[in-house]
């Protein structure tokens, strides 16, 4: 259960001096409107918490799709180069690890590391798995699903009987 910790009411007006998201996963990636005017969101209600709407490419959050034909993982790794990434399959799991050592950027020095693990569906063909990194930093891990002929879709004809059913009426 997530519990929002609020500053006392007399400190909410001093919001700029008491930042609410000092160290979050978007540290160093720019400011939101709520960072510039935090007192507007905190005076509405003590339980109001503004959600962060970001596009999929900017969120750092993965998306997993498992449909009838394939299994796909999309993961934003824009801060990592292919040499910084390791993707491996261990049993029924795929593990994606990214790490780059401390390096200098516009704001000082930064290092990043993440580790994600996803369960592979049992129907995925593990011999045909693939992984690619797009120019905009989106890692795509995919694999086709094995189609079992006994579980394939087939139409069942509906026949009409002339006599009434013997099902009990309610």
Swiss-Prot record:
The modification N6-acetyllysine is found at residues 70, 99. SUPFAM superfamilies: HSP20-like chaperones. The modification Deamidated asparagine is found at residue 101. The modification N-acetylmethionine is found at residue 1. Glycans are attached at residue 159. It comes from the Eukaryota. The modification Phosphoserine is found at residue 45. The modification Deamidated glutamine is found at residues 6, 50. Belongs to the small heat shock protein (HSP20) family. This is Alpha-crystallin A chain. The lineage of its organism: Eukaryota, Metazoa, Chordata, Craniata, Vertebrata.
